[in-house]
Design a protein with these regions (language model features):
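Serine-dependent carboxylesterase/thioesterase catalytic core
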Residues: 43, 71, 87-198, 258
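Serine-hydrolase catalytic core
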Residues: 178-234
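Bacterial N-terminal signal peptides that target proteins for export
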Residues: 1-8
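Solvent-exposed loop/turn segments at secondary-structure junctions
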Residues: 44-48, 77-81, 111-115, 136-141, ...
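C-terminal catalytic-base region of ester-bond hydrolases, centering on the histidine
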Residues: 210-314
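N-terminal signal peptide c-region/cleavage motif recognized by signal peptidases
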Residues: 19-21
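Active-site catalytic motif of lipid deacylating hydrolases and related acyltransferases
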Residues: 30-105, 153-156
Length: 314
């Protein structure tokens, strides 16, 4: 974040915390989501904080704050390697620690935000109380592997990268992002395919299962690791994004997935659940809350997890 937007964002976070405390004083707060350390949300590929009044984490921050959580929303490069995004996130975490007065934070990362928060937890575990991934491709994505079949250096790759980088630039502009990192679609692709994920895991193995579909270490270097994900690409027929995720799900050749991430690839640390009736966007309550009528509300899942962190002393 640049200095001006950083100061504004963090001051707003502090103000919202004060507002939540005022709300609690007048109307009462259960304290259900009141974690010891701030909750810091990290978006995925092509993510943002808010665009044209629509939040990436739709309805989630307000629901967490309502019962006591201090919540900060970060924004990093829409398209880049896990390491580059991690460095951007680390700088913001350091600012949040400074302004909140708390020595650590609870990181929650969706999609590519999962490897991003893992990088921060690995290089600066002293700043991190917990790292939670939601629908994150820790062992790569079959969709990324499918796209990677486009020959490197080919005209097709150049065209595809140009289109995706353009989309990333547009999202960066519309969200008012302070990230000045260039859009790097090919870097993101290399981080999210199976081979790139394996290289990343070799450098940063914390919380990653050593078996094909097991659990990882629950705690490493004082950082607690958690994860959850969905396995239903199509969940609501009136949500237009379900059509896209239903199509991308075909790249998994029958493996359970959320449309972009396989069930086993999503597992890290303590697995809360890996088969919610949710697709990749449902996991952040998108599109606009159009999720399955036959599954727990995604917002409730985040509230339950905040309570879990609270009960774990985090």
């Amino acid at each position: 974040m640049n200095n001006n937007k950083t100061l504004l964002a963090l001051c707003l976070g502090a103000g919202l915390l004060a507002s939540s405390n005022t709300y609690a004083f007048w109307f009462g707060s259960s304290g259900y989501t009141q974690t010891q350390y701030p909750v810091v949300l990290a978006h995925g590929m092509l993510g943002f904080d808010s665009i044209l009044g629509v939040d990436y984490w739709y309805g989630i921050p307000a629901a967490l704050r309502r019962d006591g959580a201090s919540v900060y929303i970060t924004e990093v490069s829409q398209l880049n390697t896990s390491e580059a995004r991690g460095e951007e996130l680390l700088a913001q975490v350091e600012e949040i620690v400074a302004i909140s007065g708390k020595p650590k934070v609870n990181l929650i990362g969706h999609s590519h935000g999962g490897p991003t928060i893992r990088y921060v937890a690995a290089v600066s575990p002293n700043l991190i109380a917990s790292a939670t991934s939601v629908g994150a491709p820790h062992k790569g994505s079959a969709t990324a592997d499918f796209i990677r079949q486009v020959p490197p250096g080919s005209a097709g790759e150049t065209l595809l990268a140009g289109i995706v980088n353009g989309l990333g630039t547009l999202i960066n502009f519309l969200s008012g992002s302070s990230s000045t990192s260039p859009q790097n679609a090919l870097g993101a692709l290399e981080s999210l395919n199976s081979e790139g994920a394996a290289r990343f895991n070799a450098k940063f193995p914390q919380g990653i299962p050593t078996t094909a579909c097991g659990e990882g270490a629950y705690s490493v270097n004082g950082v607690r690791y958690y994860s959850w994900s969905g396995t239903s690409p199509v969940t609501n027929i009136i949500d237009p994004s379900d059509l896209l995720l239903g199509a991308t799900a075909l790249t998994f050749n029958g493996e359970a997935n959320d449309g972009l991430v396989g069930r086993c690839s999503s597992r890290m640390g303590k697995v809360i659940r890996d088969n919610y009736r949710m697709n990749h966007l449902d996991e952040v309550n998108q599109t606009l809350g159009l999720t399955s009528l036959f599954e727990t509300d995604p917002v409730t899942v985040y509230r339950q997890h905040a309570n879990r962190l609270k009960n774990d002393g985090l």
